Amino acid sequence: MFYLLIFLLQMKLIKLKTDLIKAIELDRRLGFVPTMGSLHEGHKTLIKTSQKNCKKTLVSIFINPTQFNNKKDYKTYPKNLKQDLSYLKKLKVDYVYLPTIKQIYWKKNNEIKLNKSQKILCAKFRKGHFEGVLNVLDRFIELISPQKMFMGEKDFQQFFLVKNYIENKYNTKVHVCKTVREKNKLALSSRNSLLNKKSFINSGIIAKKLLSLKNEIKKNKKNYKKMIFYLKEELSKNFDIKIEYLECRNTHNLSTNIMNKPFKLFVAYYINNVRLIDNF
């Protein structure tokens, strides 16, 4: 039997799949916000957007082991369940889903594989990461059947892949919400709590430099590769970071064809052993 742990704000506990279905069957305008906990203002934006557009909102908190290609990252991922539940209660979330690993992975993973053209950006450096993301969200959507799901723009490649996969398989629409940033322009992330003071400050400076680069590329796309090269050299030299990638990609298909097309500047780097990603 498939057991679940669902905490309602009234602290009503639902253990069975059938009970979950009964709880949400009258709420077909259900909005779903998947998270891994350590909630912040970025998650708040997703939740508020869901509440504005859906009758009820369900938030999941599940640190998914299959999307980590580094066991150390999984073990050290920030965990603040007590604070998260208090935060969600203040936001008046209708349902909070807290599954265990066994409850999610009670059956064998689906064979989800990225094609060659999709193995770019984070997929190039984090083997199996997006397959893990797609697998866990596939299970969530199959179980919950939300009308809409909300994701953050900071993880744009993830949003792009999830939207294509989920909308081709289910009746759930996947929506993206704008990135929320710290005062120093660093994108809000649960990983920010792992940064020391110096790394936090430097990451903010890096974000500002990347935003400036994006604006310069808009004015002169022909020389964008050279502009990226010089900034990579500057950042690596002055901020003691290891850059995995810094690339411009078409926002419609993530191709490198950005001439006369809308585009984003994507970055992933390590600073003080903490991996950060962003896009502008």
UniProtKB/Swiss-Prot annotation:
Gene Ontology cellular component terms for the protein in this record: cytosol
Known catalysed reaction(s)?
A: (R)-pantoate + beta-alanine + ATP = (R)-pantothenate + AMP + diphosphate + H(+)
Which Pfam families does the UniProt record give? Answer: Pantoate_ligase (PF02569)
Q: Which InterPro entries match?
A: Pantoate_ligase, Pantoate_ligase_C, Rossmann-like_a/b/a_fold
**Compartments, as annotated in UniProt:** Cytoplasm
Q: Which residues bind (R)-pantoate?
A: 67, 158
Where is ATP bound in this sequence?
Answer: 36-43, 152-155, 180, 188-191
Q: Which of this chain's residues are annotated to bind beta-alanine?
A: 67
Keywords recorded for this protein, A-Z: ATP-binding, Cytoplasm, Ligase, Nucleotide-binding, Pantothenate biosynthesis
List the molecular function annotations (GO) for this entry: ATP binding; pantoate-beta-alanine ligase activity
Which EC numbers does the record give? 6.3.2.1
Q: In which pathway does it act?
A: Cofactor biosynthesis; (R)-pantothenate biosynthesis; (R)-pantothenate from (R)-pantoate and beta-alanine: step 1/1
Q: What class of enzyme is it?
A: ligase
What's a BP term from Gene Ontology annotated to this protein? pantothenate biosynthetic process
Matching entries from Gene3D superfamilies are given as: HUPs, Pantoate-beta-alanine ligase, C-terminal domain
Miscellaneous note, as given in the UniProt record, is: The reaction proceeds by a bi uni uni bi ping pong mechanism.
Q: Which HAMAP family match?
A: PanC
Question: What does the subunit section of this Swiss-Prot or TrEMBL entry state?
Answer: Homodimer.
Role played: Catalyzes the condensation of pantoate with beta-alanine in an ATP-dependent reaction via a pantoyl-adenylate intermediate.
Task: Name the NCBIfam families for this protein.
Answer: panC
In the record, the note on similarity to other proteins reads: Belongs to the pantothenate synthetase family.
Q: Which PANTHER family does the UniProt entry name for this protein?
A: CYTIDYLATE KINASE/PANTOATE-BETA-ALANINE LIGASE, PANTOATE--BETA-ALANINE LIGASE
The protein's name is Pantothenate synthetase
Q: Which organism is it from?
A: Pelagibacter ubique (strain HTCC1062)
Classification lineage:
Bacteria, Pseudomonadati, Pseudomonadota, Alphaproteobacteria, Candidatus Pelagibacterales
Q: Which gene encodes it?
A: panC
